[in-house]
Amino acid sequence: ARHFIFLEYFIIEQGKMFDPIVDILEQKAKEGVLVRLIYDDVGCIQTLPPKFYLMLQAKGIHCACFNPFRPFLSVIMNNRDHRKITVIDGQIAYTGGFNLADEYINEKMKFGYWKDAGIRLTGDCVWNFTSMFLEMWDYITKSEDDYAFYRNASIPQLGNATRNQWIATEGNTEVEGKNPAATKRMAQRRVEEPHLT
């Protein structure tokens, strides 16, 4: 990675799988790579210590917790972020059913032997994962990223090649309507790239 690394996972657990990843992310942050991580608070409620994001931020890793759990105050507790995404420089994306926890590499047998699927994607389709991550990041942090920077800095143009199709997931989150910038961007994308929705 030379520009950015984005990770978004439902479950993260400190251990043999995640700890070496943190070391790599910390090193990349020291090299000037923008590193961002999103985790779901309920997904990690039994696997991470409270305010884990502060430990990562001390290592130069920008971190956001999706929909923090507030007992007795949260009526939207079931609104969870089940995505499992890694994006590197907008050129490579990983996704699938695996989370960043030892049970996914069978270091811990929580439910017996575990085998999950994952894929590595390259090319123009990676932009879809980049923009999905940025929309979620902007929603959680109430910020507004310059999407053109991430697209133009790292995505090779494919000329007249056919764009990849993807399934919009904003219906699974409560992004639209709560973050005006994200809502505007989603509407703009539907107008500019209707074949993607």
Question: Model-predicted segments: where are they?
Answer:
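Charged, low-complexity intrinsically disordered terminal segments
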Residues: A1-T197
